[in-house]
Amino acid sequence: VICYALFNSAVLPVCDALVVNQAEEKRINFAWIRMCGTISYAVIVLGMGFYLKKRINLMFYGNSACFLVFALLCLTLPGDRKTWKVQEPDTKNPDTGKFKAKADKGPIFKSKEIYPVLVFAFAMQFGINYYSAFLGVYLLELGYSQSLLGVLNCISALSEIPVLLLIHRLSRRFKETALLTAAVGCMALRLILLSAGNVPLMAAAQLLQGPSYMVCYFVCVTYINRMVMPGKISQGQSTLAVVQMGAGSLSGSLLGGVLASAYGIREGFLIIAFLLLAVTAAAGITAGWRRS
């Protein structure tokens, strides 16, 4: 698990930076590329729910094979000049006569408007981490099987497809803060619907995966690519990964575990939903104040 977390956390930001830049250069819609991952995830979770529930160890062999193929495909990726660091000329020390390389310092982002976006990213990951971590346990507590978990996860993945088809129109029509506010609000609504423990309402909660997580993911990745300084795209995406997979995931797991132990999983869903609404309101007000 440690090895997976270390390598996955390091590879994903660089992968996002490369894919977004290559999509822009070749004029390919990034949403279509992301849709391939959505469809494959839907197929995998549906298969796992029905066929691997009695042989769960096969999942690890399957994941290992997929990561091996992923590594081989990465070897075919072309170089991307936009992700290279901008090299400043070396300076000569007048005393020693030797050249000294300048440190790669300076701001990563062009504007402080990025900080409310990072707060939205943290809030989304905080909520989705608790949601995902305790969804399976919650279903088992209610007496449902792993098959239902596979179906629900498949529904959530398929709900991302309409969003990916429309995300460029939405991005042109609405500002980033408006989209992120709506996305985190949908995440809070998902938690409230899931707490009902009713299968139709839980399915409705999964249908909000696209309007919540996918909108937040797409807006954050593409916005950061526009807001980074030249040569610091990978650092910008790494900052997003630290906020999401680092701070957001860790907080969601630790605080979520405390809430689940103290109040129960269902009550934890409701508490975190209200926390998300509070954070969203604060970030939205801050973003509006900065613009004004």
Name each region found by the language model.
Residues 51-52, 162-175, 260-261:
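Helix-to-loop junctions at the C-terminal end of transmembrane segments
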Residues 78-121:
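Juxtamembrane intracellular "pre-TM" segments in multi-pass secondary transporters
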Residues 50-67, 257-276:
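A membrane-interface helix-boundary motif in multi-pass transporters
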Residues 9-24, 215-229:
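Intracellular juxtamembrane helix-capping segments at the cytosolic ends
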Residues 113-152:
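Helix-loop boundary and gating motifs at the non-cytosolic
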Residues 1, 194-206:
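Helix-loop junctions at membrane interfaces in 12-TM secondary transporters
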Residues 67-82, 246, 271-292:
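Multi-pass alpha-helical transporter architecture, strongest
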Residues 178-193:
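Structural signature of the two symmetry-related core transmembrane helices
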